[in-house]
């Protein structure tokens, strides 16, 4: 599957609120989001599944691949396009064995060593960061900065997406590292108009 990593939205239902969640995602997709990750850390499996069904329908309507954060079981149950795992989740090779060769497998990294490990173990893309300090993840590690992001991209052949503290003010600088896309949460979902926010980020990325 050819994947456009340019603008990768990670969801946060707590940030948006349950009432406006699906509408915000729709608006973000209308604005040009190219990849969508459903991340639900504060919910049970059934609720995650029910939300996932609706989000998958939205993603399919716009032809955007849906990635599930962490939950390999729910990625399979939903027949999502892929799954994204971190350093503390199931081993990458085990995840690849479970999901098979055709699903997209993403891996969170914060160093070149972790990136090379991800490449060896079958990741399709790497989420590198946090690039800048971020308030969207309570457990976020120390920011890696642009120099390390550039080092990670130069050291692997996989697509690399920058994540963490990225928004309109710093997106151009992030792009200059040579990475393949940016992953955002609040830069779209915290904005009054998620559609306009996504369009603005895509304009910055493409120009």
Swiss-Prot record:
Pathway: Cofactor biosynthesis; thiamine diphosphate biosynthesis; thiamine phosphate from 4-amino-2-methyl-5-diphosphomethylpyrimidine and 4-methyl-5-(2-phosphoethyl)-thiazole: step 1/1. Its cofactor is Mg(2+). GO terms for molecular function: magnesium ion binding; thiamine-phosphate diphosphorylase activity. It catalyses: 2-[(2R,5Z)-2-carboxy-4-methylthiazol-5(2H)-ylidene]ethyl phosphate + 4-amino-2-methyl-5-(diphosphooxymethyl)pyrimidine + 2 H(+) = thiamine phosphate + CO2 + diphosphate; 2-(2-carboxy-4-methylthiazol-5-yl)ethyl phosphate + 4-amino-2-methyl-5-(diphosphooxymethyl)pyrimidine + 2 H(+) = thiamine phosphate + CO2 + diphosphate; 4-methyl-5-(2-phosphooxyethyl)-thiazole + 4-amino-2-methyl-5-(diphosphooxymethyl)pyrimidine + H(+) = thiamine phosphate + diphosphate. 2-[(2R,5Z)-2-carboxy-4-methylthiazol-5(2H)-ylidene]ethyl phosphate binds at residues 134-136, 165, 185-186. It is an enzyme of class 2 (transferase). Its EC number is 2.5.1.3. The keyword Transcription does not apply. Binds 1 Mg(2+) ion per subunit. Mg(2+) binds at residues 70, 89. The keyword rRNA-binding does not apply. Pfam families: TMP-TENI. Keywords: Magnesium, Metal-binding, Thiamine biosynthesis, Transferase. One of its GO terms (cellular component) is cytoplasm. 4-amino-2-methyl-5-(diphosphooxymethyl)pyrimidine binds at residues 37-41, 69, 108, 137. One of its GO terms (biological process) is thiamine biosynthetic process. Belongs to the thiamine-phosphate synthase family. Condenses 4-methyl-5-(beta-hydroxyethyl)thiazole monophosphate (THZ-P) and 2-methyl-4-amino-5-hydroxymethyl pyrimidine pyrophosphate (HMP-PP) to form thiamine monophosphate (TMP). This is Thiamine-phosphate synthase. It comes from Desulfitobacterium hafniense (strain Y51).
């Amino acid at each position: 599957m050819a994947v456009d990593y340019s603008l990768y939205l990670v969801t946060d239902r707590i940030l948006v609120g349950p009432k406006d969640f699906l509408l915000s995602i729709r608006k973000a997709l209308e604005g040009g989001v190219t990849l969508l990750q459903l991340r639900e850390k504060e919910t049970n499996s059934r609720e995650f599944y029910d939300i996932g069904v609706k989000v998958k329908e939205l993603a399919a309507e716009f032809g955007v691949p849906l990635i599930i954060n962490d939950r390999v079981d729910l990625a399979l149950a939903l027949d999502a396009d892929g799954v994204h795992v971190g350093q503390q989740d199931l081993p990458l090779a085990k995840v690849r064995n479970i999901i098979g060769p055709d699903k997209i497998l993403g891996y969170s990294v914060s160093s070149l060593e972790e990136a090379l490990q991800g490449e060896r173990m079958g990741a399709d893309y790497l989420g590198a960061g946090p690039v800048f300090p971020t308030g969207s993840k309570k457990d976020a590690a120390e920011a890696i900065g642009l120099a390390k992001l550039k080092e990670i991209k130069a050291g692997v052949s996989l697509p690399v997406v920058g994540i963490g503290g990225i928004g309109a003010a710093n997106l151009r600088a992030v792009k200059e590292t040579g990475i393949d896309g940016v992953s955002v949460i609040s830069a779209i979902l915290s904005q009054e108009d998620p559609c306009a926010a996504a369009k603005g980020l895509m304009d910055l990325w493409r120009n």
